[in-house]
């Protein structure tokens, strides 16, 4: 649990929490990988287009910058980002039949919606949907629709057991350690989410999207 405490510590006024940097690193890498996969298999591009989370054009802001913006303005506890990570995993595992994937077209909307859901479940005080829509750069109508779609997507399964929270913290901590250490030639990438909440760890991770 010590690594969880270290991971979710609040940084200074100008410092992005470590958990934000870790989650941004994972999702940015997954989006890039899925972009490459979609480019290699053009026949698979049409399937995800129907998702409410998939924008018609790529946002002009990077995943890391977008996460930093959310962290700066959302005013939520760092633990919310771990919970948002859990929610994203649940959504994507359930959404495989709908070909929902994390790529450059969907990652931003998935992030802002996952954080919104986590904040409402975790924090006693939080901003409303109109505020989060402004932070995320989308309309209030879109924010409301994405929230409902997200909740149905996870089956309203919002509770996160302490053991599950710790497991996802461990994955995020591993991401930080890999980012800080000189990478070996063939290092394993921690860019996957676990297949099972209870027992999620680096060795039990599963791809965010096929």
Regions found by a protein language model. Name each.
Residues 67-70, 84, 150:
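Short alpha-helical scaffolding segments that buttress acidic/His motifs in well-ordered protein cores
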Residues 77-81, 118-126, 158:
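Short helix-interrupting loop/turn segments at helix-coil junctions
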Residues 100-103, 121-136:
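Short conserved catalytic/interaction loops centered on acidic-Pro-aromatic/His motifs
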Residues 130-173, 179:
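Channel- or pocket-lining gating/hinge segments that regulate access to a cavity or pore
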Residues 1-79, 90-99, 163-210:
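Acidic, Ser/Thr/Pro-rich regulatory low-complexity segments at or just upstream of the first helical elements
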Residues 82-90, 108-120:
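Contiguous, well-ordered alpha-helical segments that form the cores/surfaces of helical PPI scaffolds
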Residues 59, 103-110, 142:
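Secondary-structure capping and boundary motifs in well-ordered enzyme cores
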């Amino acid at each position: 649990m010590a690594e969880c405490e270290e991971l979710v510590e609040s940084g200074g006024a100008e410092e992005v929490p470590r958990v934000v940097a870790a989650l941004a690193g994972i999702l940015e890498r997954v989006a890039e990988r899925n972009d490459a996969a979609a480019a290699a298999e053009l026949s698979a591009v049409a399937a995800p287009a129907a998702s409410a989370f998939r924008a018609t054009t790529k946002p002009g802001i990077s995943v890391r910058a977008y996460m930093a913006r959310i962290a700066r303005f959302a005013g939520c506890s760092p633990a919310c980002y771990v919970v948002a990570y859990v929610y994203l995993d649940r959504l994507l595992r359930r959404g495989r039949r709908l070909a929902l994937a994390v790529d450059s077209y969907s990652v931003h909307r998935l992030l802002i919606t996952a954080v919104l859901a986590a904040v409402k479940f975790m924090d006693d005080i939080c901003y409303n949907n109109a505020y989060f829509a402004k932070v995320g750069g989308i309309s209030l109508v879109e924010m409301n629709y994405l929230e409902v779609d997200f909740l149905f997507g996870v089956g309203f399964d919002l509770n996160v057991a302490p053991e599950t929270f710790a497991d996802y913290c461990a994955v995020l901590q591993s991401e930080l350690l890999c980012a800080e250490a000189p990478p070996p030639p063939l290092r394993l990438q921690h860019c996957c989410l676990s297949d099972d909440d209870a027992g999620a760890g680096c060795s039990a991770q599963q791809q965010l999207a096929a």
